């Protein structure tokens, strides 16, 4: 039942307004205008074309479960299952490119269980739908982080690093000679 609720209704809070979004198998791409509005698509941030590396997160491939949230709240927190737990099998997630999948596995070893499922939980809100949206946002952030390419240093950066290394080495040798000279002056000659 939790999966069907997640599949058809998602309440997301954008600029204080709660709206219902009907989902048809895949989550629609939503742009972030503020930090409260989740994005369900990801792409290569360095590219100019937003369709490059664009992958939607299919809701039907996610396993969603709800449980009791921890923390203060009295009777409400003890009665209502609002903590959302979203998981999916990383090794068979064909909607994620292979190199990104390997990077996710490498970077999130503590979130992957023995069955090979990436587990993401959220209990920030008192609403199941908001916690579900937060979990999907976390998955999107994990995938976006794994999608980012490492920064390639320019020739100027390499030259700057080499000059700093050379300067540091000269300073180290200078300090070494000073220390040696101080020790030389402390020696007593018994001749």
From Swiss-Prot:
Keyword Phosphoprotein set for record: no
Compartmental location: Mitochondrion
GO cellular component: mitochondrial large ribosomal subunit; mitochondrion
GO MF annotations, alphabetized: peptidyl-tRNA hydrolase activity; translation release factor activity, codon nonspecific
Organelle transit peptide residues: 1-34
GO BP annotation list: mitochondrial translational termination
Residue ranges of coiled coil: none
Complex formation: Component of the mitochondrial 39S ribosomal subunit.
Functional note: Essential peptidyl-tRNA hydrolase component of the mitochondrial large ribosomal subunit. Acts as a codon-independent translation release factor that has lost all stop codon specificity and directs the termination of translation in mitochondrion, possibly in case of abortive elongation. May be involved in the hydrolysis of peptidyl-tRNAs that have been prematurely terminated and thus in the recycling of stalled mitochondrial ribosomes.
Protein's UniProt name: Large ribosomal subunit protein mL62
